[in-house]
Structures are given as C-alpha cells and as structure tokens.
C-alpha cells in the first residue's frame, strides 16, 4: 500500500568535504561518510564538484542517522580514486510525516 506523506518540512544544501577511497575497475562501490544532521527518510542528491573520466555517482542515500552513503561507479579498466578533499554539495529534502490522501 502506498501513501503520500505531504509536503517537505525542510530543504537545504549542505557542503561537505570528502575523501573517498579507491574504486576498483569496472565496478560500483558504496562508501559512507559522516554528515551531521541527516536523518533516515531524508531524500538526498549529491554533486561531486569535478569530473573524472570513467567515474560517476550512481546513487546516494541516508543509510543511518548522520550517515551519507554514496555509490560510485568506475567504468574503466583501471582503479580510480576520487579526488581527495573536495567539497561535495548535498541537497537534503526532509518530508513531512503527515499522511495525506494524495491530493495536492
């Protein structure tokens, strides 16, 4: 059964400096980072500030309170380490917990 939980209570952009670990060739890997204030149920999108050939972000989520999980994809035949010390932008949308009938 699906239901609508209403509008957003809060939406904000967080800047967080990250140093992801190596991603082995031709794979995806989820890595977690501490980001204070995140809550389970928050919707997040992530933006890496620079492009790296063969490297992409294919998903991000809040895996636990204060924990951002980013899934990186390495589409090359060599290992890639995302650039260390970069400031990622994370858009956080926190839904209202009030259940509605779906009419906006």
Which sequence ranges carry the predicted segments?
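Short solvent-exposed loop/turn micro-motifs enriched in small/polar/acidic residues
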Residues: 26, 53-55
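Structured beta-strand segments within beta-sheet-rich domains
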Residues: 56-86
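Short, surface-exposed alpha-helix to beta-strand junction/turn motifs within ectodomains of secreted
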Residues: 38-49
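Residues in well-ordered beta-strands of folded domains
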Residues: 45-47, 71, 91-93
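Extracellular receptor-binding modules and their adjoining Ser/Thr/Gly/Asp/Asn-rich linkers
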Residues: 1-38, 68, 79-104
